[in-house]
Amino acid sequence: MKKISMVIVAISAMISLSGCHEDPTYVDSYFQRQSVIEELSNELKGQYSSIFIPVIYNASQEQMDYKSLWKGEVTENGQPIIHYTFGGYENRTVTLQQVPISWISFVIKDIKLAEAVKLLPDYDISIPYSFASSDEETGEASKMGKIIYSDSKVPVTLNYGGKQHLVLFNFKCPSQFVFDADKRPISPGRIQLELKSIIVDNVIVQEINGYLGGECFLSIMGKTDPISK
């Protein structure tokens, strides 16, 4: 009886393993392999520049004239240029350099908070990135992948209303750039950065959703061009 029980357990285990192998959700993705992640991230590593396109509306849906406020480098026709850096395997983040977060003041409803934010210097914003298959059903046979950017929070300390406050700007980066791993070199593509909420002392004081006709703070970095590798 004991031997029969052991045989049944062994057969059940074999069936279970066989089922896992056939189920595509258990197939090891090409883009989950450490060697692939290391190779792709080190290939992306370097300095890039891009056209910077802010789309900023206040509650009255008036677009901000950002070109007159931009203090940095511009193209021949006056479009702002932003620089950013992709870290390699050891630091898989993209750092947007000298982002004018003081412009967020144009969409803030709290007047005192808006006045304090308007005085902020430019900030570097770091966004973690990762790789994934763009077609999960094909499993490891597919080398079509995508770059995924994670959310990022920018903390600042501000004095307003007679008190010191910890303010968090919560950014979302919905961009997902699809690429073929067999075609090199890969490029980061367009990066889109959206302000989703403003948090003061651990309390959400304002949510930003331009799609509902409210305030909007959206920055689009156009096609990327490497300036050094």
Model-derived segments and spans:
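Edge beta-strand at a domain terminus
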Residues: 24-32, 164-229
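Bacterial Sec-dependent N-terminal signal peptides
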Residues: 13-43
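Tryptophan-anchored aromatic micro-motifs
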Residues: 41-65
